[in-house]
Amino acid sequence: LPVLPSKDSGSLKSLPIIFKRKALVNLYFLTATLVTAHFIAYTYIEPFLLQISGFSEGFATLALLVYGLAGIGGSILYAKSNEAGFCRNIFAPVLGIIISLFLLQYSPFYLYPLFLVAFWGACIMLFSLNGHERVIRFASDATDVAMSLYSGIFNIGIGAGALAGGLFVTQMGLSLIGFYGALLAVPTLIFCYFIQKNA
């Protein structure tokens, strides 16, 4: 097989340069905060649907399936949208996630949670794809290092969200788990403004 040299992958020497790029650092902060907020609620969505909303186990499983399928739908929307399209604006999915978290505790009719998790799932996928695309754009000369950092920060957000969600559930119960996540996520709109400004 032919040798394929790695281009613009960067190295550990690239770290100081990466952290001097304000747009990229803002994106890292946005990702850490929003993913933490998201997983405060998502980690406990099944017990929330069962114990608070009063749905059956079958319905909770269906809701998780709809969430996953909506994520696939979000990726298709992103792929088909142009650079100036609504789906490529990072502000839109962030706002969508915040709205989803705020509305989680309301269940006015039976199918409402399915519509909500579908919207939520599409938004988190759009956010993830927006984030990846911007990392590549903001660090085109050190893509591998910048993307590794982004993936690590995303995973830290998952763990932090699960931990924080567990503390909220233990201390204050499940009923407002989405509200707690939304409160943490609201300040991320500030990061969105600066990221979009430098996009």
What kind of feature is each model-predicted range?
Residues 23-64, 69:
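Extracytoplasmic gate region of multi-pass secondary transporters
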Residues 182-199:
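Multi-pass alpha-helical transporter architecture, strongest
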Residues 1-7, 191-195:
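C-terminal membrane-cytosol helix-exit motif in multi-pass small-molecule transporters
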Residues 137-174, 178-181:
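A late C-terminal transmembrane helix in Major Facilitator Superfamily
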Residues 68-76, 158-159:
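Residue-level signature of mid-helix packing/kink "hotspots" within the transmembrane helices
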Residues 86-131:
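C-terminal transmembrane helical hairpin of 12-TM major facilitator-type secondary transporters
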Residues 55-64, 109, 113, 143-147:
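Juxtamembrane helix-start elements in MFS-like secondary transporters
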